UniProtKB/Swiss-Prot annotation:
Gene: murG
E.C. designation(s): 2.4.1.227
Top-level division of the source organism's lineage: Bacteria
Protein name: UDP-N-acetylglucosamine--N-acetylmuramyl-(pentapeptide) pyrophosphoryl-undecaprenol N-acetylglucosamine transferase
BP terms from Gene Ontology: carbohydrate metabolic process; cell division; cell wall organization; lipid glycosylation; peptidoglycan biosynthetic process; regulation of cell shape
Species for this entry: Alkaliphilus metalliredigens (strain QYMF)
Length: 366
């Protein structure tokens, strides 16, 4: 079995690609996996760390406005198509998989033109531009949200799979997680995460909340993101009241345990975060990042809010007082928390990897 996978730019495109590769190699240890990305993208760092080889092509994103940058990008796109063609013919894959990001555009498009079997995976409610275009050419389209169906014309290509997540999120018990992160405490645990890189707006709001309300019936575990950590530490200072029960970390190496242990999650609305929180069935206050491409995080957040699993607060109206009111309102209403948790769990799609793998096998056999 020979599988080519392309996706990059952000962790939201790269981690699903790695998860799919891991699923295939677990089932077929002799399978050959070839990743294709850019030399400057995050994929060039994460893919080798995951144990896979990556080949590079030349490609750059297109801006929405006419600019000299776009002229250069078109030239790079043409070069990338030529490079992708060569890589595909040399590797001769059984299936070519794309997980989003502009880098997979030339690879998947060229694969369709050369007659190879192709599948794309879309993580968000509002699909990225690359996948919306590729949807017209590829054989199969795996979606994470039913709400994304409207953006693709060829309904017969669609399959609802959900987002691939690590198995640890499904295997950890509540008791084990609580023992690790909230043992012996009678306070509610609130986990705050702003995605893999953190979210400045969420961090600042939580800092202001802790300064205004240092003594609460809840404690906060704030994961700032590495680049925000020192700034947040300085803003909090060394006030004993503020940090007595609360904790601030640059990143979490054990997200599955922390997420399972918390009573309430405050987070941004990245597709993988949404998949993880629903997998463990937790209620959430979701604050979508306003600067994401196509405002896709707001679409993700709305989908979960409409299912009754979350409350959405837009960044433009977010402040410490509003967040505090939402937190205390939820924690004082046990029935509502339970209803949100149930709705969250019902929203989960935990068989994404198995479904994508089955689709790949079906394509190879057809």
């Amino acid at each position: 079995m020979r599988i080519m996978i392309s996706g990059g730019g952000t962790g939201g495109h790269i981690y699903p690609a790695i998860a799919i590769a891991n699923q295939i190699t677990e089932k077929h240890p002799q399978a050959k996996i070839q990743f294709v990305g850019t030399a400057k993208g995050l994929e060039s760092e994460l893919i080798p760390k995951a144990g896979y080889e990556i080949k590079h092509i030349t490609v750059s994103y297109l801006r929405r406005k006419i600019s000299f940058h776009n002229v250069k990008s078109i030239a790079k796109l043409i070069k990338g198509l030529v490079e992708a063609r060569r890589l595909i013919k040399d590797f001769n894959p059984d299936v070519v998989i794309g997980t989003g990001g502009f880098v997979c555009g030339p690879v998947l498009y060229m694969a369709t033109k050369l007659g190879y079997k192709t599948l794309i995976h879309e993580q968000n409610v509002f699909p990225g531009l690359t996948n919306r275009v590729l949807g017209n050419y590829v054989d199969r389209i795996a979606l994470s949200f039913e709400e994304a169906e409207r953006y693709f014309k060829s309904k017969e290509k669609l399959i609802i799979t959900g987002n691939p997540i690590r198995r640890e999120f499904l295997e950890i018990s509540q008791e084990e997680a609580t023992q690790k992160y909230n043992s012996g405490s009678k306070k509610h645990l609130i986990l705050v995460v702003g995605g893999s890189g953190g979210a400045a707006r969420i961090n600042e709001t939580v800092v202001n909340l802790l300064k205004k309300h240092p003594n609460n019936d809840f404690k906060i575990l704030l994961v700032t993101g590495q680049r925000h950590f020192e700034t947040i530490k300085l803003q909090l200072g060394k006030k004993q009241d503020t940090l007595r029960y609360n904790d601030v970390l640059p990143y979490l190496t054990n997200m599955p345990h922390a997420l399972k242990a918390c009573d309430l999650l405050i987070c941004s609305a990245g597709a993988i975060t949404i998949a993880e929180v629903t997998a463990v069935g937790k209620p959430a206050i979701i604050i979508p990042k306003s600067y994401t491409a196509g405002n896709h995080q707001e679409f993700n957040a709305k989908a979960l809010e409409e299912k009754g699993a979350a409350i959405m607060i837009k960044e433009e109206v977010l402040n410490a007082d509003r967040l505090y009111l939402e937190i205390t309102g939820l924690l004082s209403d046990k029935k509502r928390l339970e209803q949100m948790a149930k709705a969250s769990a019902l929203s989960a799609k935990t068989q994404a990897l198995e479904m994508i793998y089955a689709e790949v096998i079906s394509m190879i056999k057809s």
